[in-house]
């Protein structure tokens, strides 16, 4: 399967089912009471991190995901079934961004972790809900609310315990193959590795293991998008321990400076990670030159381990050093997960706009109209769109309890003025407050 670590998708949660407007019917009962049931909740869209998946490629064929709607309520107080939640399985290390706001909406760093990224709509209430001592046969019910829709960008940042970073042809793939059971493409030319490759490294006694990633070779300017650029730097941010793989036959100290410059430019916190230096291809130089290079690298304050991926020299020591230095996985995950930004549920503030409409007949006074926006009133009107006339009394009492009439009075509304909320119009009476 091809490797893909960025994917744009669209998700839509299910709509809530409408409540039922129904009355009980029986053979010997001419006028039964209201018995409309509630609509079901719409299904939500949920991201779920699973094992055994290392790429977003499996989602490429389906870019749009829609959860089922809730079922309508029915008579005899039967509630509509909830829509099933839709799960999108992704690799551990997947981050989801809202493409419109750019905010982080999910960051899945553990197997089994879930996050709702589009919430299903609420089911509407049936007419049985609206019975009162003075309203014993309500001929209206509530509509379900729409499910959330979102444009989402998925970015995979592989969660490997150890990341091998270095310039092209430094021997990272050979080192990964020598230490683990991975089988990367290996050749003596740059950019053999074009996507991250994971391997599993076991301790000498086979009791412990960790994952190691061969990250594609860095070039100067990678943090600005040159070469493979951000396509691989993203994955380095997830590793608990960095191994700088340097070719002893080149200029290791200068290459390490450039590597750290690129990492610092992309994300300064990367240089705070636990790290060591694997001085590779040690079989190609004599002992004196190797010792001199080690002395030059001492200024960086990192452990230096001379190794040869080709002959196996120094590999047992490198393996043990990695096990000794690895930070605790759970503690690291808790402190390095991206912070999900809380959902903002902000209700638009109430605003009243006054206008005068031209009279229908010459000589008549213009119609005084108050437009109502915000305060949640428009959303409530929409939920009774099919039965606005029958629900007028209920809505009028609801708006009174929620302070609309007091707000109109303070704004200067007069007896008989028209109040307009979307398509719903009614007359204002001073005694309503």
UniProtKB/Swiss-Prot annotation:
Residues annotated for ATP binding in this entry: 166-173, 191-195, 214-217, 280-283, 308-310
Entry keyword set: ATP-binding, Cytoplasm, GTP-binding, Hydrolase, Magnesium, Metal-binding, Nucleotide-binding
GO annotation, biological process: ribosome biogenesis
Annotated Gene Ontology cellular component terms: cytoplasm
Localization (cell): Cytoplasm
HAMAP family: GTPase_Obg
Residues annotated for Mg(2+) binding in this entry: 173, 193
Origin species: Deinococcus geothermalis (strain DSM 11300 / CIP 105573 / AG-3a)
Taxon lineage: Bacteria, Thermotogati, Deinococcota, Deinococci, Deinococcales
Quaternary data: Monomer.
Listed name of the protein: GTPase Obg
Stretches assigned to the OCT domain: 342-430
Protein function: An essential GTPase which binds GTP, GDP and possibly (p)ppGpp with moderate affinity, with high nucleotide exchange rates and a fairly low GTP hydrolysis rate. Plays a role in control of the cell cycle, stress response, ribosome biogenesis and in those bacteria that undergo differentiation, in morphogenesis control.
CDD domains in the record: Obg
Similarity comment: Belongs to the TRAFAC class OBG-HflX-like GTPase superfamily. OBG GTPase family.
Any Pfam family matching the protein: DUF1967
